[in-house]
Amino acid sequence: MSAEVALVYRVLPDSVEVNIDKLKTDIINKLSPKYKVDKVEVEEIGFGIKALRFYIRMPESEEYSSDEVEELLRSVEGVGGYELEYFSRLSF
């Protein structure tokens, strides 16, 4: 069995007016089906601003990359910024 890579991204909307649920759905739709989104958390930052934390899994392969994930995140309307918080190789 091949190894997988786990990624955790924190995504910020570009304004407080962004519907966080729609942003979450748009990002999941953009990443799927190529990348597996295991979990999404909503984080209250303050002043009405919320961030999304995406737990993503992908095969360890040249066909998959964190660079591509970031390109996909940038292409979603409403994404103001993102940060890769965690990156780890998983093998079972």
UniProtKB/Swiss-Prot annotation:
The keyword Protein biosynthesis applies. Pfam families: EF1_GNE. Keywords: Elongation factor, Protein biosynthesis. It comes from the Archaea. Gene3D superfamilies: 3.30.70.60. GO terms for molecular function: translation elongation factor activity. PANTHER family: ELONGATION FACTOR 1-BETA (PTHR39647:SF1). Promotes the exchange of GDP for GTP in EF-1-alpha/GDP, thus allowing the regeneration of EF-1-alpha/GTP that could then be used to form the ternary complex EF-1-alpha/GTP/AAtRNA. This is Elongation factor 1-beta. It comes from Pyrobaculum arsenaticum (strain DSM 13514 / JCM 11321 / PZ6).
